Amino acid sequence: SLGILNPFWEKLRLLHAGFSTDTIRIVHIGDSHIRGRILPRTTGTLLTETFGAISYTDMGINGAFCTTFTRPDRISDIAALHPDLVILSFGTNESHNRRYNTLLHYRQMDELVRMLRDSLPNVPLLMTTPPGSYDSFRKSRRRRTYSINPRTAIAVETMRRFADDNGLAVWDMYEAVGGRQRACLNWQEAKLMRPD
């Protein structure tokens, strides 16, 4: 699916080689992982240091689902930035629903992608999977206990299937940070996991 990004890679190559001076615009939308700004700012800074003229705009909302961005005004805001790449980072909040439904999640992603493609028909879309999360349970009146959210892995599979079915590139952050066995533990040990 990375071939979908070839036009974007070519723009980066031309910029890096000095054959282009056009600013490359990346818009990254998503949930609290984007709202927290650590990931998008680090990514944007590294890209700018490497390639030069990069505009990296993050639009993160705590508690966001992919449907949070299916409002016409939000799609217009994204389109007004004239992006060369749109990155979609969702899945954490969808998977926190104890009645998580793969079919519903698939349909919601489809609605967002259709709206983006209607407004930005030639812009490649890159989907990232969530990094893993914990479920919180009340053990007693004053104590809570936490366990790894088992629905994250299901949401990741749904997202990968959707991306494959619909021609989106995917960066599987869930697997990159440790997958079902280690994603949460690795993030927690690195002090990258924060409470919402």
Q: Where do the language-model regions lie?
A:
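Membrane/wall-proximal cationic-aromatic binding patches
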Residues: 1-28, 70-74
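Surface-exposed alpha-helical segments enriched in charged/polar residues
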Residues: 13, 114, 118, 157-161
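Catalytic His-Asp segment of secreted/periplasmic serine-dependent ester chemistry enzymes
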Residues: 133-196
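Proline-centered loop/turn at the N-terminus of a beta-strand
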Residues: 123-126, 169
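Residue-level recognition of beta-strand->loop/alpha-helix junctions
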Residues: 58-60, 129, 172-175
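Alpha/beta-hydrolase-fold catalytic nucleophile elbow
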Residues: 89, 128-129
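Conserved SGNH/GDSL esterase-like catalytic core that processes O-acyl groups on lipids
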Residues: 23-123, 134-136
